[in-house]
Amino acid sequence: MYIFKIAYDGRLSFQTQPHGETVCDKISNALLDCGYLDNKDRVPLYHGGRTDRGVSALGNYIVYEMDKKPVLPRVQSKLKWDGVWVLGCKEIDTFPEIEYRHYQYNLPNKNHDVELMKKASEKLIGTHYFQNLSKRDKSKVKDPVRTLYNIKISSNDYFITIDIFGESFLWNMVRRIIRLLSDIGKHKIKDPEKFIELILSEDYSKGYPPSPAEGLILVDVKTNIDVDIDSYVLRMLKNSWEKSLNNSLMRLGLCKTVLSKT
C-alpha cells in the first residue's frame, strides 16, 4: 500500500463518483495512466477526510493498494496542474492513525465582535453532542459526540481566520460552527453562552445552517506517518496559488474602486 499526501483547490468534490469528476477520480486516473495502479484497485482504501465541493485541502491523505512506488512529477503531469496536487507518498503496511484534523476558515470581516467570538468559541472546545451543528447523514448511523481540541481566532482588516482542531468531525460540522460564531460576532444571538449550551444539548433539534464551503480548507490531517514532500510538485502548487492570489488582489482593487465611487 501507498499513502499519498494531496492538496486541491475546492473546484471538485472529493469522493469517487460515477461521473468520474472528483479529486479521487482524477488521482486514480493519473495513476492508471502511468501504469502504477490496476483498474480493480482504482478506489482508494482510505482517506483522511471527505470534503464537499468548494472545500479546499492542503494536507489530506488517500491510500491505494499498489506495489510500485510512483514518480510524483510524472503523476502530476497527468493531472495537468488543474487544481489537484499529489505532494508526497510513502509505502505503508498498515493504515495511519489519525492524531487530529486541522480545518481553517477565512471569514470576511464585516465589523464582527471578534472578542465575543473568541469567548463563545471556548464553550465549544471539549467533548460535546454536536448533532445540531451537523448535517444528518441518513445513510449512516454515527455517534454525534465529538471532541474539539482547540479553536483559534485571529483577524485583520479583511478576514477573520478561524482554526479548528479535532480528531474527527460530523458532516458540515465545521461550517455550521463557523456560521454560529459569525452570527455571534454580528450580535445576532442575544445570549451566546446560553444558546451554545442549548444547541449542544439533545433537547434542541432545530439545527443550524452552514457557512459557504468556499472559505474552508483542510489544512492538515496529522497522522503517525511522515510523508516526504516532492519539492517540484510543491513549487508548482505554490505557483498556482500565487497566481490565484494576484488575480484576487486585482479583483479586490476593482471592487474597492467601484464601492468608493458609488
Curated annotation (Swiss-Prot):
The active site is at D52 (nucleophile). Keywords: Isomerase, tRNA processing. The keyword Isomerase applies. GO terms for molecular function: RNA binding; tRNA pseudouridine(38-40) synthase activity. It is an enzyme of class 5 (isomerase). The keyword Calcium does not apply. Its EC number is 5.4.99.12. Substrate binds at Y103. CDD domains: PseudoU_synth_TruA_Archea. One of its GO terms (biological process) is tRNA pseudouridine synthesis. It catalyses: uridine(38/39/40) in tRNA = pseudouridine(38/39/40) in tRNA. Formation of pseudouridine at positions 38, 39 and 40 in the anticodon stem and loop of transfer RNAs. Belongs to the tRNA pseudouridine synthase TruA family. This is tRNA pseudouridine synthase A. It comes from Methanococcus maripaludis (strain C6 / ATCC BAA-1332). The gene is truA.
